[in-house]
């Protein structure tokens, strides 16, 4: 049974009706856009959302392995492991994944934005991008806390190296710039190498 907020949200999703040879067929707007190879990554990056994004990427690859996929991102970030599941799938599949920031791409959202196919990563003009180091918190015995601290440091180093590879920035610059929350405009994100261009009109 759906809870109240979920049922209200579903009621707000527009439906699209198409005429077919067999009569009318209705889709929710996201399913209709999926037919056009458009995926929306909206909200917190977490395991359930990651599974849905991964499934859509794999489905579109099976449909047409040589056609680009368009991933629209409006996210404050979230789980590193969930984000890496999406990132690894983006790199694994045959189609190029073009990323587009609408609204904001922060933290893991910014990482996924930068992880799109080279030359096909974009921001809309008034979007915002934010990069920083991974966050973590753990309670328990001192030895366990030390283990988790070591894990977070390892993740931080790995993400910094991957961002350096995607942006073309030196690793030491990435390490400095992700030490604290680092906000950028669309133009600044393009200059930094997180995206390739700022789009104000569809080409």
UniProtKB/Swiss-Prot annotation:
GO terms for cellular component: cytoplasm; endopeptidase Clp complex. It is found in: Cytoplasm. The keyword ATP-binding does not apply. It holds the Pfam family CLP_protease. Its EC number is 3.4.21.92. Keywords: Cytoplasm, Hydrolase, Protease, Serine protease. One of its GO terms (biological process) is protein quality control for misfolded or incompletely synthesized proteins. It is an enzyme of class 3 (hydrolase). Belongs to the peptidase S14 family. This is ATP-dependent Clp protease proteolytic subunit. It comes from Shewanella loihica (strain ATCC BAA-1088 / PV-4). The lineage of its organism: Bacteria, Pseudomonadati, Pseudomonadota, Gammaproteobacteria, Alteromonadales.
């Amino acid at each position: 049974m759906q809870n109240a907020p979920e049922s209200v949200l579903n009621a707000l999703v527009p439906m699209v009706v198409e005429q077919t040879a067999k009569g009318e067929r209705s889709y929710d707007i996201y399913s209709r856009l999926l037919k056009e190879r458009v995926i929306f990554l909206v909200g917190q990056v977490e395991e359930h959302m990651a599974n849905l994004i991964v499934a859509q990427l794999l489905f579109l690859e099976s449909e047409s392995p040589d056609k680009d996929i368009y991933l629209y991102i409006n996210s404050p970030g979230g789980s590193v492991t969930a984000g890496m599941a999406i990132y690894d799938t983006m790199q694994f599949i045959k189609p190029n994944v073009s990323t587009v920031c609408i609204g904001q791409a922060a933290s893991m959202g910014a990482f996924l934005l930068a992880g799109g196919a080279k030359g096909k990563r974009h921001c809309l003009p008034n979007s915002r991008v934010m990069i920083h180091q991974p966050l973590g918190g753990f309670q328990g015995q001192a030895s366990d806390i030390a283990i988790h601290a070591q894990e977070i440091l390892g993740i931080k180093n790995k993400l910094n190296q991957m961002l350096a590879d995607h942006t073309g920035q030196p690793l030491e610059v990435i390490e400095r710039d992700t030490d604290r929350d680092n906000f950028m405009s669309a133009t600044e994100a393009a200059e930094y190498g997180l995206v390739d261009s700022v789009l104000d009109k569809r080409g």
